[in-house]
Amino acid sequence: MFLRISGRVRLNSHSLNAQGGGGTNYVEITKAKVSIKNDDRWEILEVPAISGNMVKHWHFVSFVDFFRETDYKDNLTERALRYNGARFGQETKAKKADGSEVELKDESEIIKNFADADVHGFLAPKTGVRRVSLVKTSFILPTEDFIKEVDERLVYAVKHNRVDIDEKGAIKSGEEQTAQMLFNREYATGLYGFEIILDLGFVGVPQSSPSNPVIEDDERKARIVSALKALIPMLSGYIGANLARSFPVFKLEEMIAVVSEKPIPALVHGFYEDYVEVSKNVVENAKKLGFEIEDFGYNVDFGESVSSVEELISKIIEKL
């Protein structure tokens, strides 16, 4: 099963991806440069961004949470229980969630024993074994039409303070004590586009020597379902840092999705103002070439209408 999703979310007062700030009292939000065409003139602009690495991490977190609810919960790396991705170092063996060890010599054995390495990929540099992630995420960026229409700065700073108290609950004072620690943190607001690709048809299938899946059908389905369900928290706001003190004022504005039993073209990123129309052309022409595709849309004229991310995922799971 192969799924492609693009769409747009409204994010107000978010600080989902920060950089720098070490040793300073100023925490800067991550930024990226984008190309925008105004009439016949191209511009390169710096905008706030949420990196694909951050988005992928939060899919990984939710995947682990959902997979731990299945009968195959021990088939995870021990690192996954701490939400660390399958980035092996110089070791030649890795521990499973149940404490047993697996040799990192063969891709088939690794993905058989580690669902997180199967779905999210891995690299074992000591043995030279690797696997490309089946989950691919783009940067989340302010949309080009939003950038053109809004003159306000997309990034702003808010001053915070931490109050230091003693064991009696009183605010500390004195030369060597800090009553208040002031710091500034950047936040951003805007309409953002995203794109996610899930190549779940390759779950359990070695990439080094493609063959039949090396895991049983029931576990394979459990891995696929967990990867699909992991999209639900992501598309409700669980996609970045600083969630405890500034959970994003998040709303999914629109979304398009296509699913097939075989690999299919990617949709156009939600960054582009014409992403729905161009994606529709991609799907229609792909169908003419023989691709069997089911298409879905939320708040847009695109394929079968769905009322939420949850309904989309439910419809896809029903087809497994």
UniProtKB/Swiss-Prot annotation:
CRISPR (clustered regularly interspaced short palindromic repeat) is an adaptive immune system that provides protection against mobile genetic elements (viruses, transposable elements and conjugative plasmids). CRISPR clusters contain spacers, sequences complementary to antecedent mobile elements, and target invading nucleic acids. CRISPR clusters are transcribed and processed into CRISPR RNA (crRNA). Belongs to the CRISPR-associated protein Cas7/Cst2/DevR family. Subtype I-a/Apern subfamily. It holds the Pfam family DevR. It comes from Methanocaldococcus jannaschii (strain ATCC 43067 / DSM 2661 / JAL-1 / JCM 10045 / NBRC 100440). Keywords: Antiviral defense. GO terms for biological process: defense response to virus. InterPro entries: Cas7/Cst2/DevR_sub_I-a/Apern, CRISPR-assoc_Cas7/Cst2/DevR, CRISPR-Cas7/Cst2/DevR. It comes from the Archaea. This is CRISPR-associated protein Cas7/Cst2/DevR.
